[in-house]
Amino acid sequence: MITTEIKRVKNHINGEWVESTGTEVEAVPNPATGKIIAYVPLSPKEDVEKAVEAAKAAYETWSKVPVPNRSRQLYKYLQLLQENKEELAKIITLENGKTLTDATGEVQRGIEAVELATSTPNLMMGQALPNIASGIDGSIWRYPIGVVAGITPFNFPMMIPLWMFPLAIACGNTFVLKTSERTPLLAERLVELFYEAGFPKGVLNLVQGGKDVVNSILENKDIQAVSFVGSEPVARYVYETGTKHGKRVQALAGAKNHAIVMPDCNLEKTVQGVIGSAFASSGERCMACSVVAVVDEIADEFIDVLVAETKKLKVGDGFHEDNYVGPLIRESHKERVLGYINSGVADGATLLVDGRKIKEEVGEGYFVGATIFDGVNQEMKIWQDEIFAPVLSIVRVKDLEEGIKLTNQSKFANGAVIYTSNGKHAQTFRDNIDAGMIGVNVNVPAPMAFFAFAGNKASFFGDLGTNGTDGVQFYTRKKVVTERWF
């Protein structure tokens, strides 16, 4: 239930809501207004240790619950999430700022991840080969690995936690969750519904906070694996620190996703696709299109239509249904984004749509409108860096080959898209582009939960991605059994 009172956020440890043992807190504003809606604790190491102890104790019994029973329990959780979809979407819009339409879509994608977790009995099946030698059989068995942890970002406060803890718990593990201190309210509601579904205490524990919580998770000897989603520098740190302490780590990092626009594309659908990918969720997503490589032959026509359609987008509070671009998460991020726009102008790019001057229209929130640059090149920071905002750079290329070369020069390799009606172009793109997730006339090539989600290069640190069979492999340990009976 959403109220107007300012809330003091708590941790959830061993089945109970508890105050942090620390005294430091951080204010949580509504990004659309700047008004404080909550205070979140910046929990110390001691709170993490209590959560891990609770998870360890719960693991002794939870890991022995039959796999189908664990899945049935998760199905109850799935039903509660479905019953509370509207409330969950409103909480996301309140504390994250994205439009209610975008928030509703996120809720659905989170629910799909839990649907995957309910199918764990199929995904956890091992392998067997009888008679590998005279009278000897071989088999592979999958077992849970123990206490695992997830560290999640502000931009998808429902979907990304639900990539992690339902699947890990379905595999028989117990979980310590640290969500972004910028979006603590949705995390609270996810945990409330989890225990309404009847799970034993200590199976899922929530510790709110910042860097101290992250470091405590990475250094705790009883945590066996860590899942992370966030920026590239922090992902690299999480991976290096976690593996140094003997943990499995999957760290999904930053992005600079490119789209190549071919002359044979469907122009109207391509323009709408680029707009949706670049500017929905205020561009604060790792699968947003941030660079368009448009072939010269169609460039002028494409840009004219793109600019005209972009100028129609309304910016403002995500609760107002006419608004397409909501606020950025914080004032500090807004200032960072404005710095990138200013650098693009200073570096000589042509600013076709300027999202800086909108305060008179939208008030005191952390707003930056949809922004488009033309004439961008690889020497500019707006091409090189992840901006994480509704800022789109256009690079003109002579053909598909040059577009692929440009895309592959980025240090990031999360997603990439081609807009074309030519199957040969699509095949060439698919086979030569360096990206973990590829779209052909698909605006945001984020796969469904039964496929793995992960990028390449500086967009991912680790071996196994989230979701799908990758997720099950990450949260389980194999035992290879060779047996003979006399």
Swiss-Prot record:
Q: In which pathway does it act?
A: Polyol metabolism; myo-inositol degradation into acetyl-CoA; acetyl-CoA from myo-inositol: step 7/7
What Gene3D superfamilies does the annotation carry?
Aldehyde Dehydrogenase, Chain A, domain 1, Aldehyde Dehydrogenase, Chain A, domain 2
Say if the entry is tagged with keyword Oxidoreductase. Answer: yes
Which CDD domains does the record associate with it?
Answer: ALDH_F6_MMSDH
UniProt: NAD(+) binding residues: 154, 178, 181-182, 231, 386
Q: Which InterPro entries match?
A: Ald_DH/histidinol_DH, Ald_DH_C, Ald_DH_CS_CYS, Ald_DH_N, Aldehyde_DH_dom, MeMal-semiAld_DH, MSDH_GmP_bac
Residues annotated as catalytic: 286
Q: Which domain of life is it from?
A: Bacteria
User: What biological processes does GO assign it?
Assistant: inositol catabolic process; thymine catabolic process; valine catabolic process
A GO MF label:
methylmalonate-semialdehyde dehydrogenase (acylating, NAD) activity
Write down the chemical reaction(s) this protein catalyses: 3-oxopropanoate + NAD(+) + CoA + H2O = hydrogencarbonate + acetyl-CoA + NADH + H(+); 2-methyl-3-oxopropanoate + NAD(+) + CoA + H2O = propanoyl-CoA + hydrogencarbonate + NADH + H(+)
Q: Which UniProt keyword terms apply here?
A: NAD, Oxidoreductase
Keyword NAD listed? The answer is yes
| Listed EC numbers | 1.2.1.27
Q: How does it assemble?
A: Homotetramer.
> Its function?
Catalyzes the oxidation of malonate semialdehyde (MSA) and methylmalonate semialdehyde (MMSA) into acetyl-CoA and propanoyl-CoA, respectively. Is involved in a myo-inositol catabolic pathway. Bicarbonate, and not CO2, is the end-product of the enzymatic reaction.
Which protein family is named in the record? Belongs to the aldehyde dehydrogenase family. IolA subfamily.
Name by which UniProt lists this protein = Malonate-semialdehyde dehydrogenase 1
Lineage here is:
Bacteria, Bacillati, Bacillota, Bacilli, Bacillales
Q: Its gene?
A: iolA1
